[in-house]
């Protein structure tokens, strides 16, 4: 039985991971949990899964959590704040840590887990996007496994099983196209928050659903694929696949193409990240190709999705630039969800922040450099958004790449 620590237990990734644990109690057990602010759900999870150690990100809610589980016996060790989440991530009994925390907040806990010798089921893509230059050397140093738990990178990882070194030519990431896949570009100025949160295929959290609508999510996945699989940006492509049945593909040196297919269900990549290299039999709905119907593809519209090209440009720059773009995006999406900037302002303010940071980019950043870049970008987005016209004028360097 594998002992698991779950970071972000009350979020979308966390609840689906717990569905798996509940369905396969002879395979997995939860020893540690960390969550944000949802005390009601967290207390229910503690009662059901009986973790040994729990952290809540908001220290002000620790006493309320204690009261909510006062009758639980035995009591888990309770911690709070960022330091508490980091301690849970490194907790001794866990073999694998599922990183379901949204955004760059997952970076420090993931690093702590790696240093403690835990295998990582990576559902927090920002860990690699912002921290790749630091995280990858630590993974190698501590001899842990970094297993992708999101659908696209899990698909690539599965397709690569048995492919000899040097056999991979190209990665093809599939994208649903998000909420505005079928909207004309001319209609995008009318986008509301409610519109952006209507994903056609997947059930996800608000931030990642907006990222899907801007296609920044796919741009971030390009950078993640670069770090995970060591593939140059020139050999990572994106294609719109509206049905979300093919989760990604690889092309081999002989032009053979391998793909991983399945219904849009995050539990499958999560399960594989926990069971690898084994396959666990499930009773989940099997893919019916006749029922799924046509599988279609189209080229992304660069005018509709400017975030996609921005991510390629920033990825090629390397260093701390991906951390800046990632943090700028997180802050911009938060402002959009608060209706403080428009949907079309999201790529504009992000590119403005990236343009302003370029001259101070560090190509071999330390963890401190990455965290400083992250904080700089968040503040810069607030500054840009408070100006009257947060409109970008792309730098020659960004435009030329």
Swiss-Prot record:
Transmembrane segments: none annotated. The keyword Manganese applies. Mn(2+) binds at residues 150, 152, 221. Its cofactor is Mg(2+); Mn(2+). It holds the Pfam family DXP_redisom_C. Keywords: Isoprene biosynthesis, Manganese, Metal-binding, NADP, Oxidoreductase. It comes from the Bacteria. It catalyses: 2-C-methyl-D-erythritol 4-phosphate + NADP(+) = 1-deoxy-D-xylulose 5-phosphate + NADPH + H(+). NADPH binds at residues 10-13, 36-38, 124, 126, 205. 1-deoxy-D-xylulose 5-phosphate binds at residues 125, 151-152, 176, 199, 212, 217-218, 221. Pathway: Isoprenoid biosynthesis; isopentenyl diphosphate biosynthesis via DXP pathway; isopentenyl diphosphate from 1-deoxy-D-xylulose 5-phosphate: step 1/6. The keyword Oxidoreductase applies. Its EC number is 1.1.1.267. GO terms for molecular function: 1-deoxy-D-xylulose-5-phosphate reductoisomerase activity; manganese ion binding; NADPH binding. One of its GO terms (biological process) is isopentenyl diphosphate biosynthetic process, methylerythritol 4-phosphate pathway involved in terpenoid biosynthetic process. Belongs to the DXR family. HAMAP family: DXP_reductoisom. PANTHER family: 1-DEOXY-D-XYLULOSE 5-PHOSPHATE REDUCTOISOMERASE (PTHR30525), 1-DEOXY-D-XYLULOSE 5-PHOSPHATE REDUCTOISOMERASE, CHLOROPLASTIC (PTHR30525:SF0). Catalyzes the NADPH-dependent rearrangement and reduction of 1-deoxy-D-xylulose-5-phosphate (DXP) to 2-C-methyl-D-erythritol 4-phosphate (MEP). This is 1-deoxy-D-xylulose 5-phosphate reductoisomerase. The gene is dxr.
